[in-house]
From Swiss-Prot:
Stated name of the protein: UDP-N-acetylmuramoylalanine--D-glutamate ligase
Compartments where located: Cytoplasm
Magnesium recorded as keyword: no
NCBIfam families: murD
Residues at which ATP binds: G104, S105, N106, G107, K108, S109, T110
Catalytic activity from the UniProt record: UDP-N-acetyl-alpha-D-muramoyl-L-alanine + D-glutamate + ATP = UDP-N-acetyl-alpha-D-muramoyl-L-alanyl-D-glutamate + ADP + phosphate + H(+)
EC number(s) from the headed UniProt entry: 6.3.2.9
Molecular-function GO terms, alphabetical: ATP binding; UDP-N-acetylmuramoylalanine-D-glutamate ligase activity
Length: 416
């Protein structure tokens, strides 16, 4: 066994703040080294008992709110703070593997998953890590050609020395305003990815900063200069927002020097993400769509704008609002939504934004919202779960929320 080094410095004492899946991955990795003491702070009371000056390094889990007491004390030790991705980078930086990092408010999970899918379909060894669910250090023992990393603003705030071969920002819209002073601070946290990337581009539909390279969208299809490459109907996806996602992936592959025509064939096979604008079933001529991964206002707006051209959506909205500005969706509500059922911990907060702009009803929970929506829905209408909120008031995460919705649809079908 060997000692643990970071930036060529021997580390003998490390404090781990937070012990979720990321913290556990760091702990498991450090178990491979000798001569290192690791202390773990799992809650506020434990944290205040540690002398931060006494540690060589401090790893912080992304879920730790650095803007709140007692964790504000960490801001004085910025040079000591590292993320799990910094540690991962230290041990792969001398390999030939290429690293690609993607951040954004909406679309980043689709972009990184599609990129990873295409790379594998083209015959490369690729790993997909980060905010998508798999900590990077869990893959440290694997051999790979490409590492695709989904990064959140919280992770970027913790970066110390990582250098990605390519960084990309897409679709920055208000989110996590419970962790940031304002939208500008949140947006800047995303833009800071550029500081940690050798190559970098922005494709931001919301703010009009779109590096599209040689690609453009014309009438539901992607063109490269004047050559048509792909029509949305040739894919297993739907909506212009997915054409935007494909353009981001094509630009990533371009910058990696890969064959775009072969990549197009791979993209046609990509089935999209679970819980992201997925048609569950048509029951009694009503279509039920699961967009549980729509955890902020921008994601729900994108869903509303891509699903229909008519005012025929019954929307299930609610959960933990994270300080979101629901007034931003008023235009889309007016154009596409027949009725809204609002549920969850922040239902009154949401109501305060949309009251007077649409027909709605407050509900106790998502199940009640579903039952009422299925009763109200008429033929050829759509019941859409796109909550624009986090799910932790009622569920373990967006995936469980989506699964519960799918089960409710299945039960409804059995009764029909």
């Amino acid at each position: 066994m060997f000692s643990f080094y970071f930036n060529d410095n021997k580390i003998t004492k490390l404090l781990m703040v937070g012990y979720g899946s990321t913290g556990k991955s760091v702990c498991d990795f450090l178990a491979n080294f000798i001569d290192i003491t690791v202390d773990i702070s799992q809650n506020d009371d434990e944290f205040v008992n540690y002398d931060l000056n006494s540690y060589d390094l401090i790893t912080v889990s992304p879920g730790i709110p650095l803007n709140k007491s007692p964790y504000r004390a960490l801001t004085k030790f910025k040079d000591k703070i590292v993320s799990d991705i910094d540690i991962f980078y230290q041990y792969i930086k001398d390999t030939k593997a290429k690293t690609i990092a993607v951040t954004g408010s909406n679309g980043k999970s689709t972009v990184v998953t599609m990129t990873d899918f295409v790379l594998k379909d083209l015959g490369y060894k690729s790993i997909l890590v980060g905010n998508i669910g798999t900590p990077a250090l869990n893959k440290i023992g694997e051999k790979f050609d490409y590492c695709v990393v989904e990064v959140s603003s919280f992770q970027i705030n913790l970066f110390n020395c990582v250098r990605f071969d390519l960084g990309c920002i897409i679709n920055v819209s208000p989110d996590h305003l419970d962790r940031y002073q304002n939208f500008e601070q949140y947006k800047q946290s995303k833009l800071n990815l550029a500081k940690f990337s050798n190559d970098f581009f922005v494709y931001d539909v919301h703010n009009g900063i779109k590096y599209a390279g040689e690609y453009q969208i014309i009438r539901g299809a992607i063109y490269r200069n004047s050559t048509k490459l792909l029509d949305i109907v040739e894919t297993k996806l739907f909506g212009e927002h997915n054409l935007e996602n494909i353009i981001v992936v094509l630009n990533i592959l371009d910058r990696l020097g890969l064959d775009i025509n072969q990549a197009i064939d791979s993209i046609k096979k990509f089935k999209g993400l679970e819980h992201r604008c997925k048609i569950v079933k048509k029951v009694n001529s009503t279509t039920y769509i699961n967009d549980s991964k729509g955890t902020n206002v921008g994601a729900t707006i994108a869903a509303l704008n891509s699903i229909t051209n008519s005012k025929n959506i019954i929307l299930l909205l609610g959960g933990v609002a994270k300080g979101g500005d629901f007034s931003l969706m008023i235009k889309s509500l007016d154009k596409y939504v027949k009725y809204v059922y609002i549920y969850g911990a922040d239902k009154e907060y949401i109501e305060s934004y949309i009251k007077g702009y649409c027909k709605y009803q407050l509900c106790n929970n998502m199940k009640q919202a579903f039952e009422l929506s299925s009763q109200k829905a008429n033929s050829n209408e759509i019941v859409l779960l796109s909550p624009a909120c986090a799910s932790f008031d009622e569920f373990s995460g967006y995936a469980q929320r989506g699964e519960v919705f799918q089960n409710l649809v299945a039960q409804l079908e059995q009764k029909s």
